[in-house]
């Protein structure tokens, strides 16, 4: 935790500030070890948590090397915060206009920026990597469960219920990802052509390609993987598309290494799909950072100017989406080393159930 705090302050100092103020729960947790309704303050003097009475007990119990101060909620918490920041040059992750203006009235420098938080969180420490690997192993177990459970006549919603029950029994929970209403993406047949498909009551039928994207939180950290299964008699086209996506993902994984550009990983995946004539059906970036949030830095995209660094945690997830027909996506979470340290062991060969 001390190394994390040192890194946070290093990035804070780079933008001309000496104090970090965290409102977002992910940043609060990274800074303090406590996830809840509170404000975190970090400077060279130490770390303080400003929390309402209902959170004080848990904040004291769960935080690491933090002073916990009780406050009122809302404006009361902001008043307590400002009173503790006299003369501070503040960087905050808040985007709330009223909060920022109130701070600016009382403090010499207030910079709204998530950059110090995201830059520090980009590189995972050994504890974070250990948690991510455990989370990934549970997702592998869930894919084994898919092989046993998926059947003709089962609905996407029914499969999600089975999988979430298994996950929650093992300490994994939904991430609160804002692009979907459901905790998982389970998309059969034509629904699979929608990368962020909502889980529906549609029942699986013979010939379906079924995209199962598992993105779940374990001890605060998110693991993310996707496998696509076939059900019954699978068309020649579906098998062909699956093999192209598999080759694309393998090329992307081979391109991953410390000091390689994020763009080069995207290029490696995209060239395979384009060469096979499906380029216009690969409609998203190749991957993203993972950690305390589903999508973190870096972005694995043809637009990215970032170079990979050792111990970044990223995904590689090419896909082909044929409207009104089916989709195929294959995704792994991995740790960047001299090569890709893939955290998932479940096969990427096409399984036809």
Predicted regions and their residues:
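Active-site neighborhoods and metal-handling regions in enzymes and metal-associated proteins
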Residues: 1-353
């Amino acid at each position: 935790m001390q190394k994390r705090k040192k890194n946070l302050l290093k990035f804070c100092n780079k933008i001309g500030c000496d104090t970090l103020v965290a409102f977002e729960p992910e940043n609060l947790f990274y800074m303090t070890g406590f996830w809840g309704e509170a404000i975190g303050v970090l400077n060279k003097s130490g770390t303080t948590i400003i929390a309402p009475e209902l959170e004080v007990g848990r904040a004291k119990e769960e935080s690491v090397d933090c002073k916990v101060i009780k406050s009122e909620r809302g404006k009361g918490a902001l008043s307590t915060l400002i009173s503790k920041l006299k003369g501070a040059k503040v960087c905050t992750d808040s985007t709330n206009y009223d909060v920022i203006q109130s701070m600016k009235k009382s403090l010499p420098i207030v910079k709204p920026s998530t950059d110090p938080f995201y830059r520090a969180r980009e590189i995972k420490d050994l504890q974070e990597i250990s948690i991510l690997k455990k989370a990934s192993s549970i997702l592998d177990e869930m894919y084994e469960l898919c092989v046993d459970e998926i059947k003709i006549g089962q609905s996407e919603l029914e499969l999600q219920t089975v999988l979430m029950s298994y996950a929650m029994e093992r300490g994994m929970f939904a991430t609160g990802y804002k692009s979907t209403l459901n905790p998982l993406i389970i998309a059969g047949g034509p629904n699979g052509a929608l990368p962020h498909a909502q889980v529906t009551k549609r029942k699986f039928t013979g010939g379906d390609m079924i995209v199962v994207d598992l993105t779940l939180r374990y001890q605060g950290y998110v693991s993310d993987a996707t496998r696509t299964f076939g059900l019954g008699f699978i068309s020649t086209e579906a098998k062909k598309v699956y093999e192209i996506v598999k080759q694309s993902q393998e090329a992307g994984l081979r391109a991953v290494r410390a000091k390689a550009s994020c763009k080069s990983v995207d290029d490696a995946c995209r060239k395979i799909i384009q060469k096979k004539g499906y380029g216009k059906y690969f409609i998203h970036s190749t991957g993203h950072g993972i950690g305390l949030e589903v999508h973190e830095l870096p972005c694995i995209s043809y637009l990215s100017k970032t170079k990979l660094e050792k111990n970044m945690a990223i995904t590689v997830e090419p896909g082909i989406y044929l409207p009104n027909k089916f989709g195929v996506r294959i995704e792994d979470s991995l740790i960047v080393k001299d090569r890709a340290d893939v955290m998932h062991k479940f096969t990427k060969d096409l399984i036809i159930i």
